[in-house]
Amino acid sequence: PFQVYRHLVGSKQIEDTLIYEEKDPTFHVSVGNSRSMQFIEIDISSTTSSETLLLKSSNPLESPAIFFPRVLNHLYSVEHDPEHNRFLIHTNWKAKNFRLMETALQKSKKRSQWQEIVPHKDSVLLQSVLSYPKNIVLMERESGLRRLRVLDAKGNFERVVSFNDPSYTAYLAANPEYTSTKFYYGYSSMRSPDSIYSVDLQSGRKRKLK
């Protein structure tokens, strides 16, 4: 995909408005809602660079705004955290294994105004991030194995989700609700078939769902 159109419900498709077109064939374009449901995200990415454009869900007729313009060899993605009036940024800027930063939307175009929450680690790959009103959930990889780490909203450590097997596969499942008190992950090993679990963000209690 390389184009994004705006469609007015009830109108003819031929009347749709082109709001973004990617000229570089090495980039892929996708569209989705932020987990807060307050923004529509247009994500543009290649193997070495990425860029996010935002539209307020309350005003989808406006033009999309660039969060931070693409730069060669800079990959990033964002998580809206309305509870703290910020965006979390999963970025490889000066961090080959990625780190977590934050900024207010009005400061997003200047990386010098981004603030670090989780620093880069040479031995740990930060793969993905989920934001919640009181917590941040990280999917990391160390020594070939993934782990799930729960932080408070300031980035202070709270807990690691424990796995019983020495070798396993774990992944974040669908977690569409920013305001949820739980998050969901998938897990499998030689002894355990692929299953989905929930984790209570306050107590850390795990529950097998299927």
Annotate each PLM feature.
Residues P1-K210:
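Peripheral, non-catalytic segments that deliver or gate enzyme domains
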